[in-house]
Amino acid sequence: MHDITSSKKMENGIVVFWDENGEKKNESFNYIELVDMKINALDLLERPKYYKVDVAAHKLIVQK
């Protein structure tokens, strides 16, 4: 599980970024996936550091 450092709006979803071993990594989530995980897309864009990403499970976790 990795702490998200930033996020960016895409045409059909949001891409999140994190640092792993000094390298910037990313994973994208479409809006349907975000709704299914009960993630507020606007909150993810405005407060990305409140979230963690589990790349293996392709999930976002709120860490407020």
Region annotations inferred by a language model:
Residues 2-34, 38:
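N-terminal acidic leader/helix
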Residues 36-64:
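Mixed-charge, Lys/Arg-enriched low-complexity segments
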